[in-house]
Amino acid sequence: MERSLKNVLVVSCGFLLLFTAYGGLQNLQSSLYSEQGLGVATLSTLYASVLLSSMFLPPILIKKCGCKWTIVGSMCCYVVFSLGNFHANWYTLIPTSILLGLGAAPLWSAQGTYLTTMGNLQAEKVGKLGKDVVNQYFGIFFLVFQSSGVWGNLISSLVFGKMSMQEAIPEEQLMSCGAKDCLMGPAATNSTHHPSQQLIYTLLGIYTGCGVLAILLVAVFLESLEDKLENEGERRPRPPPLWSTLLSTFMLFRDKRLCLLMFLPLYSGFQQEFLSGEYTKSYVTCALGIHFVGYVMICFSAMTALCSLLYGKISKYTGRAALYALGAAIHFSCIVVFLLWHPNTNQLPVFFVLSGLWGMSDAVWQTQNNALFGVLFEENKEPAFANYRLGEAIGFVIAFGYSSFLCVSTKLYILLGVLSLAMVGYGTVEYLEVKAASKVLGAEKKNQAEEEEMKTKI
């Protein structure tokens, strides 16, 4: 196995273990800690911290520590959050959620920088296009990473599975499910009893163990990017001054392409929050019961994982524009269905089909967005990925902010609007890229013609 691919698999498996723990724990926050809104407050604090972290920390940590040790250090923040859940209260969850948020942006920026650099080095080595290898590496990563949703939800479903004591769902409650949910209908009663402390400790022990294994895997087996560059004969760049690094995230906004593309990560945050927050609560839990949430999310994660690998493979044949068109078409269709559909207990397959379709489209945003930012901003990868996480965090914060007081139908219309803006911005950037490429090609042809003319005269 080639060394670059081995490194990609190490990063992927590390993230798989880490987010098997974090993803499962995140989905249970609002259910386990509903008293005085502690769970929702924890998630809101977490993503606000991610937003602040995205502005400053990623370029600094990556420049000072390198991609490998930035990933290791950031993973430690996730494990601390898991430990904080063993004695859950305002004094443990809020500080540890802030710490996790501070580590999240550097973690993802380092991952994006690492995979992009590895892809470009491998492309030079084998004589392929850099964007094709980068797309392939992101496809492999998200195939492995997205399966964490399967394992995380499966673990929680198995641990809490014996507790399911389903009650009949009243017809009055079904009438307020779906897009009609305006937080004024009857409260969902078809939930399980609160799990015992022993079961919670069992689950947290498994999740914490997964996080520790992730740290050890990356620390021991991942090759340092700086060592890799030296081995490939690349010169290690001299670190820029601290203030230059601090400002690099914001200075990149002078590139109009970034301004146009920021709606893509913004929409990514919106759509992820909708599925995990609104779909699971207003559709699945409301109509089927909370014990079905894990299984529906497994379907989503499995489809996202499989499609991530598929898109990474076929992008060099179809081009990224076709994949973005596919992703947008699927989400447009799903949003329309969500607006018109009245969920019912007799329509069980529909819940899984819609979850799977949402996963097909989510795979486009996850693989292509990361590859797009890595390819377009190759010279400024760290600030580019920091801005990507900033946009995604803003999407999460806004969506969590209005989640408690807007009807689901209104949230769907907002989602539709942001998706439209994202596609317009992306389409404009593609047009600018084609236009710039044609200018370069025209200039090369002109120079070639002039050279031939000079040779003829001689």
Swiss-Prot record:
GO terms for cellular component: plasma membrane. InterPro entries: Ion_channel_UNC-93 (IPR010291), MFS_trans_sf (IPR036259), UNC-93_regulatory (IPR051951). Glycans are attached at N190. It comes from the Eukaryota. It is found in: Cell membrane. Keywords: Cell membrane, Glycoprotein, Membrane, Transmembrane, Transmembrane helix. It is a multi-pass membrane protein. The chain crosses the membrane at residues 8-28, 42-62, 69-89, 90-110, 140-160, 202-222, 258-275, 286-306, 321-341, 345-365, 390-410, 412-432. It holds the Pfam family UNC-93. Its main location: membrane. Signal peptide: none annotated. Belongs to the unc-93 family. PANTHER family: PROTEIN UNC-93 HOMOLOG A, UNC-93 RELATED. This is Protein unc-93 homolog A. The gene is Unc93a.
